[in-house]
């Protein structure tokens, strides 16, 4: 053997030994994670400011600071710290950054400006409610934003109050609105989100819009700075008939609103080019469960759909001179592309995302400036980092490695793509397998089928702390995009329109069969879990097969009638998921309810829900748990205090969710929880 060959062999052996010495991820590593969000590139394209998020073990919250980094990867340094800063936005001169900051002990954020040359930070406005949708005027003298303006509800009755010093019970809450609570936000107070402008030098903000209607999203300035374009649904029956917003031009001097669009469907996300052309997103409302979001441009009075042949949802249009940068999901991967001035689509980059830490959903964001795009980049082995790419498609560079210090000390599970053929109709079903660290193809491993929610959503080759922790415990993890998933076209998504659950069950079972065909999955140790829409499908699965050793049903819908009459999104569900109301067609609701099949369940099943969940209300989980107990099925009920639908939105929630799921599976033959500690 030559000296060179010997050296290569020694390096390979040393690397393998080093990998074996690194332990897998553990539950407390949740609190070690960091990720980037909201990268904003300077007008000259040379510097990116972004929010650096950390999962704080002391406060059990996601906290963030603003950092900057040059487009060549140098000069990585903090800009604003200690105030949970968010939403950085460059001034047109590139010398100032507006952002939101939270004072110690306060829930709401205030609008601030950082002067980069001097390092001075000044408050622009301290507001009674948190601002959003920050947008600088083209000349840098004003900032537009939206915020909630309280209204006054007319009292139902005028009643005597308590005498001075008396302690009476709290007054009843009187509700006379259609939308009266929102998951994670509590009861909806009287009032609406309105549009404001304020001088960039500070002062009193000026309210431009009024009335009982919300202004949505981020406003867009016209090039002359005289007007803003916003999205708003200003119909009187908007609460009872969602999904029909229009674009409006708002005169900055007078507040006069002029409607720009008029059709059945949502028009939103306006972006205005240098010549005043408006790019925006829109969808034609056909009352389908899944409706594509398309790109339109409006030049003067005429609006035209761009890329009519592209069968994918488009997101977040942003101008780069006379071209438009967009993002879209394609087969589980989020891509960045340029719509050229000839109406063609040119690819820039892929793997945008990484801000959904728990499960491998899409997400992330990008910004455009100085001939470059800054975006959040993800992969199966890391959450969101900051990356840049040139508008011409060159110069792709990952700028940060926020978790390098952690992942150099841990061994992650490797991810491979898998396809299955559905037993329902032969359609191809896309999925991914996460293999345990130290994987040995000659062994047989237990498998966890993890099902995404939505149901109109998608998983992909993105970082997932939950999947990695299951793999760290010794499981092969299978996650898939059954019919109904987005990023495969409108027809594929609408295969479950008015038919969910249904043949998506067959897609999932065929994917499990494909995983078994890999040769390293133990057919006697199969487990299943999913949340929200995935919880619906998990409950449906155990009502139709006994092939799984145990199941965890997280925040499910169990009875579609009771869900429609208790959930915060009931109006949306009635319009887009069913043709008639429950009392008009009760069978349509019951035949799709997992509760209808609970009498066939034999699989040990744990139910998991947040006690403040109003998206899939806790009463759904209560029904299922009590039905399981009445049927004598081994079962447990885990209720998370203070948690809404986002059980894992707080770091401890993510850690505990995984811990309880692993403990339940361990009870029924899965690997010991200690393997993931």
Describe every region a protein language model picked out.
Residues 235-236, 394, 402-524, 531, ...:
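Cap/lid segment of the alpha/beta-hydrolase catalytic domain
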Residues 466, 479-677:
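Active-site-proximal cap/loop segments of hydrolase catalytic domains
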Residues 70-74, 115-119, 199-203, 251-255, ...:
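Short loop/turn segments that connect beta-strands within beta-propeller blades
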Residues 45-48, 94-98, 143-144, 225-228, ...:
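Hydrophobic beta-strand positions that form the internal "hydrophobic ladder"
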Residues 40, 144-147, 172-176, 181-194, ...:
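Non-catalytic accessory segments flanking enzyme active sites
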Residues 52-65, 79-86, 98-112, 126-132, ...:
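A flexible loop/linker signature enriched in serine peptidases of the S9 family
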Residues 28-64, 190:
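Beta-strand-rich domains and repeat architectures in extracellular enzymes and scaffolds
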Residues 43-44, 92-93, 138-139, 223-224, ...:
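Residue-level detector of Asp-centered blade-edge/turn motifs that repeat once per structural unit
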């Amino acid at each position: 053997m030559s000296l060179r060959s010997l050296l290569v062999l020694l390096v390979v052996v040393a690397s393998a030994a080093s990998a074996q010495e690194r332990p897998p991820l553990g539950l407390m590593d949740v609190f070690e994670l960091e990720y980037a969000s909201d990268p904003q590139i300077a007008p000259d394209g040379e510097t990116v400011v972004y929010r650096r998020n950390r999962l704080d073990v002391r406060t059990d919250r996601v906290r963030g600071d603003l950092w900057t980094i040059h487009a060549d990867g140098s000069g990585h340094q903090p800009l604003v710290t200690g105030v949970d800063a968010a939403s950085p936005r460059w001034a047109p001169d590139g010398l100032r950054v507006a952002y939101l900051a939270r004072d110690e002990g306060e829930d709401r954020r205030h609008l601030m400006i950082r002067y980069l040359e001097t390092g001075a930070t000044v408050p622009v406005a301290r507001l009674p409610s948190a601002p959003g949708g920050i947008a600088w005027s083209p000349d840098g003298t004003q900032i537009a934003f939206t915020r909630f303006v309280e209204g006054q509800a007319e009292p139902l009755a005028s009643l005597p109050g308590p005498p001075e010093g008396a302690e009476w019970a709290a007054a009843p809450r009187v509700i006379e609105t259609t939308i009266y609570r929102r998951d994670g936000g509590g009861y909806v107070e009287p009032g609406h989100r309105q549009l404001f402008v304020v001088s960039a030098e500070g002062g009193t903000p000026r309210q431009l819009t009024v009335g009982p209607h919300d202004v949505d999203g981020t406003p867009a300035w016209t090039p002359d700075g005289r007007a803003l374009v916003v999205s708003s649904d200003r119909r009187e029956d908007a609460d009872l008939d969602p999904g029909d917003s229009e674009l409006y031009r708002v005169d900055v001097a007078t507040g006069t609103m002029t409607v720009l669009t008029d059709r059945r469907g949502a028009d939103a996300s306006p972006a205005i080019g240098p010549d005043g052309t408006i790019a925006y997103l829109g969808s034609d409302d056909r009352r389908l469960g899944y409706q594509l979001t398309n790109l339109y441009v409006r030049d003067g009075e005429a609006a035209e759909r761009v890329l009519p042949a592209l069968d994918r949802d488009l997101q977040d249009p942003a101008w780069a001179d006379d071209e438009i940068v967009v993002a879209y999901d394609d087969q589980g991967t989020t891509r960045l592309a340029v719509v050229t001035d000839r109406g063609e689509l040119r690819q820039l980059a892929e793997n945008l995302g990484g801000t959904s830490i728990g499960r491998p959903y899409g997400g992330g964001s990008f910004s455009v400036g100085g001939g470059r795009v800054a975006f959040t980049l993800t992969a199966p082995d890391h959450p969101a980092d900051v990356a840049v790419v040139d508008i011409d498609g060159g110069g792709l560079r990952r700028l940060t490695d926020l978790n390098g210090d952690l992942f150099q000390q841990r061994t992650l599970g490797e991810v491979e793509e898998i396809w299955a053929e559905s037993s329902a109709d032969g359609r191809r079903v896309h999925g991914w397998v996460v293999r345990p660290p130290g994987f040995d193809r000659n062994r047989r491993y237990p498998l966890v089928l993890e099902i995404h929610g939505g149901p109109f959503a998608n998983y992909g080759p993105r970082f997932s702390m939950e999947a990695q922790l299951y793999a760290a415990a010794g499981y092969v993890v299978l996650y898939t995009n059954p019919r109904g998933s987005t990023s495969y076209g409108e027809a594929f998504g609408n295969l479950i329109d008015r038919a969910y659950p249904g043949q998506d069950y067959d897609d999932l079972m065929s994917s499990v069969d494909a995983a078994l065909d890999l040769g390293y999955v133990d057919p006697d140790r199969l487990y299943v879990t999913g949340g929200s829409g995935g919880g619906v499908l998990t409950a449906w699965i155990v009502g139709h097969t006994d092939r799984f050793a145990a199941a965890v049903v997280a925040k499910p819908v169990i009875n579609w009638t009771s869900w429609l009459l208790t959930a915060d999104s009931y109006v949306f569900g009635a319009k887009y998921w069913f043709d008639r109301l429950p009392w008009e067609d009760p069978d349509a609701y019951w035949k799709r309810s997992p509760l209808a099949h609970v009498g066939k369940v034999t699989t040990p099943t744990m139910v998991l829900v947040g006690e403040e969940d109003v998206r899939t209300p806790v009463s759904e989980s209560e029904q299922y748990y009590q039905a399981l107990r009445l049927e004598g099925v081994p079962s447990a009920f885990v209720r998370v205090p203070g948690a809404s639908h986002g059980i894992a939105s707080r770091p401890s929630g993510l850690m505990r969710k995984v811990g309880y799921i692993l403990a339940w599976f361990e009870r029924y033959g899965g690997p010991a929880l200690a393997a993931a500690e």
